[in-house]
Amino acid sequence: MGHPKLKATREIKIDFHPSELDDTIVPEESKVKAKDYLTSKKLAEDDIMLMLDTKVIYGYDYLYKDKKLILPEVNPITIFYANAVMSYGRLEHYKKTLLTESSEAGKVGKVVNLNHSGTFFQLAVNSIINLQATLESFANRTIPKEYEFIDKFGKTIINPTVTHKLYNTIPKIKNIDFKQGKYKKYNKCIDSLIQLRNDIIHLKPAEKTNTGYKGIYRNLLDFDFQKAIASVKMFINFYEPDLIEECTCGQNFAFDTVLNQ
């Protein structure tokens, strides 16, 4: 699985090279404003654009060691999704290690290593939470701030769930519905993802036994991460084509545990 591309929050394709721009057409008032900006430590609240060879991307300024830097604003949807994929990169390896190196009931002799469990579940939780964040950040970006959420009885919803946003609100805004037709099969996986994420965030030990977290651990071991990653990509790209793309560099990057020498 190749690593996903990171993308800017906004970009505009251009059919000219930035070197072709004529400085003489810039109004004097704009030149004065630009000079004042460059010589002050005040950060801009206006749009800042970075001109590249084939496109313009939006960014923001940041003071670092008395220097005003211009940084590209990366779309958080692509950050969260990349985090999820990179967390998954070594997940199957550590799952296999955990299951093959653990003690078998009725047998003795295996050394118990908490790191085998810890490493797998760290990456598993990271992947789940970032996949959910991918969906929720996409919903929050798509839905206008002033949008009024209404339930099926016509009453206002004060705190809509992410499921309501994904399955009720976005289809109304986009006039297309991911739950219809051939995409239906992905919804069950997305529902399971959201439920598992909620179980993790609101984790509370079961009171019936002294191993209060075994339920969530079993669910994480059983969860189909690869299908969930594909389902989230399908959902996002259904509404915003090609927002989630694999990089063409051919390299696979993954988060891993590293022993400092």
Question: Where does each model-flagged region fall?
Answer:
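Amphipathic alpha-helix face/heptad-repeat signature
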Residues: 80, 123, 130, 186-189, ...
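Surface-exposed polar/charged interaction patches
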Residues: 40, 44, 83, 87-97, ...
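Short, hydrophobic, well-ordered secondary-structure elements
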Residues: 120-144
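Amphipathic, Lys/Arg-enriched alpha-helical patches that create a basic surface
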Residues: 199, 211-261
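Non-transmembrane, amphipathic alpha-helical segments
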Residues: 72, 112-126, 182-185, 217-220
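Extended intrinsically disordered or low-complexity regions, especially N/C-terminal cytosolic tails and loops
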Residues: 1-121, 249-261
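Flexible secondary-structure boundary motifs
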Residues: 137-215, 234-239
